[in-house]
Amino acid sequence: RVEEIFEQATKLNLKTQIIKHGESINKGMEIVLINSFGVLNYYYDYCKSIFIGKSLEKKLISVSGQNPLEAARAGCKIYHGPYVYNFHEIYEFLSKINITKKINNTDELAARLIQDFRTVKNINAKNIKKINIYGENILKKTTKEIIKLI
Protein backbone atom coordinates (compact mmCIF):
# COMPACT_ATOMS: atom_id res chain seq x y z
CA ARG A 1 0.00 0.00 0.00
CA VAL A 2 2.84 2.43 0.78
CA GLU A 3 4.24 2.11 -2.74
CA GLU A 4 0.79 2.81 -4.23
CA ILE A 5 0.37 5.96 -2.12
CA PHE A 6 3.90 7.05 -3.03
CA GLU A 7 3.14 6.68 -6.75
CA GLN A 8 -0.11 8.66 -6.46
CA ALA A 9 1.56 11.48 -4.52
CA THR A 10 4.44 11.61 -7.00
CA LYS A 11 1.99 11.87 -9.91
CA LEU A 12 0.51 14.90 -8.14
CA ASN A 13 4.00 16.47 -8.03
CA LEU A 14 4.14 16.28 -4.24
CA LYS A 15 7.56 15.90 -2.67
CA THR A 16 7.15 12.48 -1.10
CA GLN A 17 9.45 10.20 0.86
CA ILE A 18 9.13 6.67 2.22
CA ILE A 19 10.95 6.25 5.52
CA LYS A 20 12.08 3.05 7.16
CA HIS A 21 13.24 2.71 10.77
CA GLY A 22 16.01 5.14 11.68
CA GLU A 23 15.95 7.23 8.51
CA SER A 24 15.75 11.01 8.56
CA ILE A 25 13.17 13.12 6.78
CA ASN A 26 14.65 14.85 3.76
CA LYS A 27 14.35 18.64 3.70
CA GLY A 28 11.35 20.02 1.81
CA MET A 29 9.18 16.90 1.95
CA GLU A 30 5.44 17.52 1.68
CA ILE A 31 4.36 13.94 2.36
CA VAL A 32 6.24 11.43 4.47
CA LEU A 33 5.15 7.79 4.50
CA ILE A 34 6.50 5.88 7.48
CA ASN A 35 6.87 2.22 6.60
CA SER A 36 8.02 0.92 9.96
CA PHE A 37 6.28 -0.21 13.13
CA GLY A 38 6.80 1.45 16.51
CA VAL A 39 8.69 4.57 15.42
CA LEU A 40 5.94 7.12 14.84
CA ASN A 41 6.58 9.06 18.05
CA TYR A 42 10.00 10.05 16.77
CA TYR A 43 8.47 11.73 13.70
CA TYR A 44 5.39 13.40 15.23
CA ASP A 45 7.44 16.40 16.37
CA TYR A 46 8.13 17.19 12.71
CA CYS A 47 4.49 16.94 11.60
CA LYS A 48 1.72 19.52 11.61
CA SER A 49 -0.92 17.13 10.34
CA ILE A 50 -1.28 13.39 10.16
CA PHE A 51 -3.79 10.93 8.74
CA ILE A 52 -4.63 7.85 10.79
CA GLY A 53 -4.69 4.77 8.61
CA LYS A 54 -7.29 1.98 8.54
CA SER A 55 -10.06 4.53 9.00
CA LEU A 56 -11.33 5.26 5.47
CA GLU A 57 -11.84 1.71 4.23
CA LYS A 58 -15.12 0.10 5.28
CA LYS A 59 -13.66 -3.36 4.68
CA LEU A 60 -11.31 -2.70 7.63
CA ILE A 61 -14.14 -1.72 10.01
CA SER A 62 -13.45 -4.57 12.46
CA VAL A 63 -9.85 -3.36 12.97
CA SER A 64 -10.50 0.26 12.16
CA GLY A 65 -8.45 3.19 13.30
CA GLN A 66 -5.24 3.50 15.26
CA ASN A 67 -4.53 5.15 18.60
CA PRO A 68 -4.24 8.93 18.03
CA LEU A 69 -3.10 9.96 21.52
CA GLU A 70 0.65 10.09 20.86
CA ALA A 71 0.18 12.27 17.78
CA ALA A 72 -2.20 14.49 19.74
CA ARG A 73 0.35 14.88 22.55
CA ALA A 74 2.87 16.07 19.96
CA GLY A 75 0.49 18.82 18.84
CA CYS A 76 -0.45 17.29 15.48
CA LYS A 77 -3.77 17.98 13.78
CA ILE A 78 -5.24 14.52 13.20
CA TYR A 79 -7.42 13.48 10.29
CA HIS A 80 -9.26 10.18 10.26
CA GLY A 81 -11.99 8.46 8.32
CA PRO A 82 -15.39 7.39 9.67
CA TYR A 83 -14.17 3.96 10.79
CA VAL A 84 -12.46 4.34 14.15
CA TYR A 85 -14.12 1.47 16.00
CA ASN A 86 -11.06 0.56 18.07
CA PHE A 87 -10.68 4.04 19.58
CA HIS A 88 -14.13 5.61 19.15
CA GLU A 89 -14.25 7.26 22.61
CA ILE A 90 -10.76 8.74 22.22
CA TYR A 91 -11.65 10.26 18.85
CA GLU A 92 -14.82 11.79 20.33
CA PHE A 93 -12.78 13.36 23.13
CA LEU A 94 -10.14 14.73 20.73
CA SER A 95 -12.82 16.05 18.38
CA LYS A 96 -14.37 18.05 21.22
CA ILE A 97 -11.07 19.88 21.78
CA ASN A 98 -10.59 20.38 18.02
CA ILE A 99 -7.61 18.08 17.56
CA THR A 100 -9.17 15.49 15.28
CA LYS A 101 -11.27 16.00 12.19
CA LYS A 102 -13.26 13.27 10.50
CA ILE A 103 -12.90 13.21 6.73
CA ASN A 104 -15.04 11.11 4.43
CA ASN A 105 -12.84 10.61 1.38
CA THR A 106 -9.39 11.22 -0.05
CA ASP A 107 -10.43 14.43 -1.81
CA GLU A 108 -11.50 15.95 1.49
CA LEU A 109 -8.22 14.81 3.07
CA ALA A 110 -6.22 16.38 0.25
CA ALA A 111 -8.07 19.70 0.62
CA ARG A 112 -7.42 19.76 4.38
CA LEU A 113 -3.73 18.95 3.98
CA ILE A 114 -3.26 21.62 1.32
CA GLN A 115 -4.83 24.12 3.71
CA ASP A 116 -2.52 22.93 6.51
CA PHE A 117 0.59 23.39 4.34
CA ARG A 118 -0.10 27.13 4.58
CA THR A 119 -0.14 27.25 8.38
CA VAL A 120 2.35 26.77 11.18
CA LYS A 121 2.14 24.04 13.79
CA ASN A 122 0.20 25.29 16.79
CA ILE A 123 0.85 23.44 20.04
CA ASN A 124 -1.83 24.19 22.63
CA ALA A 125 -0.41 23.44 26.10
CA LYS A 126 -3.88 23.36 27.70
CA ASN A 127 -5.05 20.73 25.22
CA ILE A 128 -1.94 18.64 25.74
CA LYS A 129 -2.56 18.73 29.50
CA LYS A 130 -6.16 17.57 28.90
CA ILE A 131 -4.88 14.77 26.67
CA ASN A 132 -2.38 13.64 29.31
CA ILE A 133 -5.06 13.57 32.00
CA TYR A 134 -7.38 11.66 29.66
CA GLY A 135 -4.63 9.12 28.94
CA GLU A 136 -3.87 8.71 32.65
CA ASN A 137 -7.56 8.06 33.34
CA ILE A 138 -7.65 5.39 30.63
CA LEU A 139 -4.62 3.73 32.21
CA LYS A 140 -6.21 3.79 35.68
CA LYS A 141 -9.45 2.24 34.37
CA THR A 142 -7.56 -0.42 32.45
CA THR A 143 -5.42 -1.25 35.48
CA LYS A 144 -8.54 -1.67 37.66
CA GLU A 145 -10.07 -4.04 35.10
CA ILE A 146 -6.88 -6.11 34.92
CA ILE A 147 -6.69 -6.33 38.72
CA LYS A 148 -10.26 -7.70 38.76
CA LEU A 149 -9.15 -10.52 36.48
CA ILE A 150 -6.10 -11.46 38.51
Predicted features by range, described:
Residues R1-I150:
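Nucleotide-activated sugar donor-binding and catalytic core shared by glycosyltransferases
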